[in-house]
């Protein structure tokens, strides 16, 4: 069993560069199945989710080459083989294969999504969209079987009953080669949706409106190869900004798009965090006299659910009391119990997190219960006096590229230990 060991209480200083967006690349890679030539992705993060996706693509017959942060995928040899639950149960984003396989082959058998345990993640919106486009869906144990083999996919008007990033992207992927026009109403607006649409358009798709709540897709017969640069990871950026404010003595975060983080940064400014925003970087000063605030997550451009956990340790430095309410994943509270082991004054009731800042944290043995909870524990361990040991670190490695090396370069006493 691997674990992360941190000797905390050290001031950190220096620069850190943000990798490509995890939440983009996990959709971009399956979308490449639709191309009839090589697609190259730049700025691909070195995370275990990418390694898993590459393995799946190779099992299906794709040729994949990786060097540094470049991923070159030739999908011409892909075959439509069933992908059972066992092979992809670590991936939340396995459902993107639904759209890409339907779009290329007219059918798909894929295991149900895995990933972090944040409560129910229904795929009903995905299925509703596919069925509107002419597919049938049925469960076979832990697998989903989809078929539009007889009639093929056709355009449709689809209203998303709730705002869903995954369902919006999946519908776009399925619709780009469907016959006719597809209109997605009440679409999610996240930057990652724009990134996927940009790749697909560069491959020859006709998508308009990505980043707004109405997306229009006119189907095309073929998609060609292209080269695409993955956008910076706004969640990784927000995590390191929170870390820099919590334990930094001056840290510059490079490869950041401020416009993707405006809601998050506004809340930090409400706390009193001092920072300087440049064109593609943010410099976070050493902090003092921070104020407790309330956080409520919301779909983009609101406060991202993926950032409420990484922000929590910084909130514990602030003076006063506050609440955190996650309206997206109300069960995203498991980090609270681990932070309490580190002597944090924090609790949860009825899905609300209640905290009182100002108490020093102490090192402890804790467990990462999901990806962003793991990030919160890393930050807390860097803040705490003494040694912190974090287990279940596979969650952390799913989403944070080179996290140990990046933190060591700032002066952190952190290491990965093989038990």
Swiss-Prot record:
Keywords: Cell cycle, Cell division, Cell shape, Cell wall biogenesis/degradation, Cytoplasm, Peptidoglycan synthesis, Pyruvate, Transferase. Its EC number is 2.5.1.7. Phosphoenolpyruvate binds at residues 22-23. PANTHER family: UDP-N-ACETYLGLUCOSAMINE 1-CARBOXYVINYLTRANSFERASE (PTHR43783), UDP-N-ACETYLGLUCOSAMINE 1-CARBOXYVINYLTRANSFERASE 2 (PTHR43783:SF2). The active site is at residue 116. The gene is murA1. Belongs to the EPSP synthase family. MurA subfamily. It comes from Streptococcus pneumoniae serotype 2 (strain D39 / NCTC 7466). This is UDP-N-acetylglucosamine 1-carboxyvinyltransferase. Its main location: cytoplasm. NCBIfam families: murA, PRK09369.1, PRK12830.1. The modification 2-(S-cysteinyl)pyruvic acid O-phosphothioketal is found at residue 116. Cell wall formation. Adds enolpyruvyl to UDP-N-acetylglucosamine. Target for the antibiotic fosfomycin. Involved in heteroresistance to antibiotic fosfomycin. Heteroresistance is the ability of a clonal population to grow one or several subpopulations at a frequency of 10(-7) to 10(-3) in the presence of a higher antibiotic concentration than that predicted to be effective by measurement of the minimum inhibitory concentration (MIC). Disruption phenotype: No heteroresistance to fosfomycin. It is found in: Cytoplasm. Gene3D superfamilies: Enolpyruvate transferase domain. GO terms for cellular component: cytosol. HAMAP family: MurA (MF_00111). GO terms for biological process: cell division; cell wall organization; cellular response to antibiotic; peptidoglycan biosynthetic process; regulation of cell shape; UDP-N-acetylgalactosamine biosynthetic process. Pathway: Cell wall biogenesis; peptidoglycan biosynthesis. GO terms for molecular function: UDP-N-acetylglucosamine 1-carboxyvinyltransferase activity. The keyword Transferase applies. UDP-N-acetyl-alpha-D-glucosamine binds at residues 92, 121-125, 306, 328. It catalyses: phosphoenolpyruvate + UDP-N-acetyl-alpha-D-glucosamine = UDP-N-acetyl-3-O-(1-carboxyvinyl)-alpha-D-glucosamine + phosphate.
């Amino acid at each position: 069993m691997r674990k992360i060991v941190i000797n905390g209480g050290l001031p950190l200083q220096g620069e850190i560069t943000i990798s490509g967006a995890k939440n983009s690349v996990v959709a971009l890679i399956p979308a490449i199945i639709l191309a009839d030539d090589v697609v190259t992705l730049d700025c691909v993060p070195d995370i275990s989710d990418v390694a898993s996706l590459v393995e799946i693509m190779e099992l299906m017959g794709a040729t994949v080459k990786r060097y540094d942060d470049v991923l070159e995928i030739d999908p011409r040899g892909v075959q439509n083989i069933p992908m059972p639950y066992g092979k992809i149960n670590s991936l939340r984003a396995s459902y993107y294969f639904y759209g890409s396989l339907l779009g290329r082959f007219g059918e798909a058998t894929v295991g149900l999504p895995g990933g972090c345990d944040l409560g129910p993640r229904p795929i009903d919106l995905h299925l509703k969209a596919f069925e509107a486009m002419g597919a049938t869906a049925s469960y076979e144990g832990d697998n989903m079987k989809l078929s539009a083999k007889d009639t093929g996919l056709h355009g449709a008007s689809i209203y998303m009953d709730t705002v869903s990033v995954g369902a919006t992207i999946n519908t776009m992927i399925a619709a780009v080669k469907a016959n006719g026009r597809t209109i997605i109403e009440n679409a999610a607006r996240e930057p990652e949706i724009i990134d996927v649409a940009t790749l697909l358009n560069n491959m020859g798709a006709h998508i308009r409106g990505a980043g707004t709540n109405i997306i229009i897709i006119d189907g095309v017969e073929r998609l060609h190869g292209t080269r695409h640069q993955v956008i910076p990871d706004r969640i990784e950026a927000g995590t390191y900004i929170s870390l820099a404010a919590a334990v930094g003595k001056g840290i510059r975060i490079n490869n950041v798009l401020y416009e993707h983080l405006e809601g998050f940064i506004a809340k930090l400014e409400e706390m009193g965090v001092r920072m300087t925003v440049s064109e593609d970087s943010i410099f976070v000063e050493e902090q003092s006299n921070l104020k407790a605030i309330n956080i409520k997550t919301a779909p983009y451009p609101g406060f991202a659910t993926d950032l409420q956990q990484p922000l929590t340790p910084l909130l514990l430095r602030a003076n006063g009391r506050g609440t955190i309410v996650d309206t997206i994943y109300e069960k995203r509270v498991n980090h609270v119990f681990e932070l309490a082991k580190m002597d944090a004054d924090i609790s949860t009731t009825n899905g609300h997190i209640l905290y009182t800042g100002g108490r020093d944290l102490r090192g402890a043995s804790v467990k990462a219960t999901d990806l962003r909870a793991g990030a919160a524990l890393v930050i807390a361990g860097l803040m705490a006096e003494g040694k912190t040991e974090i287990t279940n670190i596979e969650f952390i490695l799913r989403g944070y590229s080179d996290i140990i090396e990046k933190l060591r370069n700032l002066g952190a006493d952190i290491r990965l230990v093989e038990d």
